[in-house]
Amino acid sequence: GDGEYLVRVGTENRQHVMGHISLLGYGGRIIAPMTTGGSNESALGDPIEILLTEWARQCHKQGGLVILPHFPNPRLESAAAIVGGEIDGVEMTSWGDLYSGINPYSLSDWYRYLNCGYMVAAVGGTDKMTAMTAVGTVRTYAQMDKDQAFDYQAWMDAVRAGRTFATYGPLIEFAVDGRPMGSRIAMSATGGTVDVVWQAASVTVPMSRVELIVNGEIRESVAVDAANASGHWSLRVDKSAWLALLVRGHYPDRPEIVAAHSTPVMVDVEGSPFQAAADAVTILEQIEGAMAYLDT
């Protein structure tokens, strides 16, 4: 890098059923094998000799950042990796379709973990496989600490802290009681009211709506100017909740898309753990399915 732009090469290690995993910014020797357990990702008949969680632990040991790319597919081991605290972020993408925005399938599965209290940052990634999509179509923006130098380590620290949003164009600021994205706010058992402040601007995808997502549901929604908007809401919180900002937009003569999404702020109310029975059952079933696949 030259001080304004930094480029760092990482790897996407793969197992065609257990999942893919992006290992970024680590030092030392390359984390191998990069593929295992064929047939689509490795040699035909190749046994599974390493798991996603093992790749993730080695990356963390070598100082790197661990991302689940094109989340949630392939999905089998991602549940165990997230629950085990091995994942720093999940990648929102549209699988090559510039005009479809952040895929709702990615969002709904990410929401499942947030609903159970697992705070994992949102990141954006193009997953460019063809000439149909330009590099950087969907991006990650991470807010670094003001006292940190502009370097890759500072960027990784910001992603780990969840000070991120994924976007197809709109830039957003979002704070809950003055706390940035990725924060955790502790409340007494009586709950309380939080002040939500936001701002959004776009010179690419025209914006149409800004929404406040609370525990996976739309709590507030407002139509906005295509280029610039701001606002605030006061929200009563009686049980533990996560709050995030979602920006919708659309290109001319195209359907509305999810154009940007923040990492949430988690509000922990004393005596009210994050609970979502249906989501928890699905996560457990996925972990059990991964174990069954390995056993057979």
Range-by-range predicted roles:
Residues 1-122, 126, 132:
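Catalytic cores of extracellular degradative/oxidative enzymes
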Residues 76, 116-121, 126-296:
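C-terminal functional module detector
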